[in-house]
Amino acid sequence: MLNQRIHPGMLVLLMFLYHFMEDHTAQAGNCWLRQARNGRCQVLYKTDLSKEECCKSGRLTTSWTEEDVNDNTLFKWMIFNGGAPNCIPCKETCENVDCGPGKKCKMNKKNKPRCVCAPDCSNITWKGPVCGLDGKTYRNECALLKARCKEQPELEVQYQGKCKKTCRDVLCPGSSTCVVDQTNNAYCVTCNRICPEPTSPEQYLCGNDGITYASACHLRKATCLLGRSIGLAYEGKCIKAKSCEDIQCSAGKKCLWDFKVGRGRCALCDELCPESKSDEAVCASDNTTYPSECAMKEAACSMGVLLEVKHSGSCNSINEDPEEEEEDEDQDYSFPISSILEW
């Protein structure tokens, strides 16, 4: 009875409208790069995508919302509401999840798929501890690879064995050379690299030796050839400063004046000294005994004066050898070589 009352042409039109609306609904969603802990979608990737198109990449964190909303609503969601509501994750299981190299998908305690670090350690022959480029000792190379996967993508093994305070017994791989930095830590560095010419004035660096280096690469190379740390005084070309007032340090650093050579250098002064009774007292270059090296640094930052360790223990306990003091002239506690050699 109903079909007899509707014109055949009207049925064709209704069928066309139905399929158009169905297709439009399938295309009207928004694709997001992640689902936050609050359950909302965050980091908008693309609008007007179907769930199938949004989720075909295989990324674990990709999510989708079906609401077809205007730009104003999207803006409010992202800025004021912590993301878009009704967030649908693309992946509910680990099936076809691509976590990338060194990772694999596992279901967590909440029965949700998560990418976890799982480096391939099957080809590692050295099973003992290794020293990383960050100056930390890892129990083995596999532990270092996991740390690299989690938070340090540039982390590499610099030499086998625990990190050392001297180049003695350090076997550097390939053509790299062992140098000791200003905090008395041994690092393996490459001296034969070719440094490109600077393309910007911002690349110039002033070394603790009062010499201007064209770039961090040039400072690395000079450090390597010297065999011990030069250290960074401040960014930019070296100037004939009369005091720290003439030196502009980057954010978070403070100028300390070295009265011995009449130069200033920028240092990090935000270190808090732990309350530990195990620290060894040090005799500083101002002939004052400090309870620890950290306490000496704290005093230096407070006074705006560069202080260096002359020797361990009380200043009254050892008659300093002038030759040894000369050897430590360029020591600097503010800029570990890891930050200089890996720029």
From Swiss-Prot:
Tissue expression summary: Ciliary ganglion neurons. Levels are higher in the iris than the choroid.
Main location: secreted
GO biological process: negative regulation of activin receptor signaling pathway; negative regulation of amacrine cell differentiation; negative regulation of embryonic camera-type eye development; negative regulation of embryonic pattern specification; negative regulation of horizontal cell localization; negative regulation of neuron projection development; negative regulation of retina development in camera-type eye; positive regulation of retinal cell programmed cell death
Compositionally biased region (Acidic residues): 320-332
UniProt-annotated stretches for the region Disordered: 315-343
Range of residues in the leader sequence: 1-28
Compartments, as annotated in UniProt: Secreted
Database matches in InterPro entries: Fol_N, Follistatin/Osteonectin_EGF, Kazal_dom, Kazal_dom_sf, Prot_Inhib_GrowthFact_Antg, TB_dom, TB_dom_sf
GO CC annotations on file: extracellular space
Domain TB: 29-102
UniProt entry keywords in alphabetical sequence: Disulfide bond, Glycoprotein, Repeat, Secreted, Signal
Pfam families membership: FOLN, FST_N, Kazal_2
Residues carrying a glycan: N123, N287
SUPFAM superfamilies the UniProt entry points to: Kazal-type serine protease inhibitors
Disulfide-bonded cysteines: C31-C54, C41-C87, C55-C90, C94-C105, C99-C115, C117-C149, C121-C142, C131-C163, C191-C224, C195-C217, C206-C238, C269-C301, C273-C294, C283-C315
Every Kazal-like domain range: 99-165, 185-240, 263-317
PANTHER family, per the entry: FOLLISTATIN (PTHR10913:SF6), FOLLISTATIN-RELATED (PTHR10913)
Subunit annotation: Monomer.
Cited function: Binds directly to activin and functions as an activin antagonist. Inhibits activin A signaling in the iris and regulates somatostatin phenotype in ciliary ganglion neurons. Specific inhibitor of the biosynthesis and secretion of pituitary follicle stimulating hormone (FSH).
Protein name, per record: Follistatin
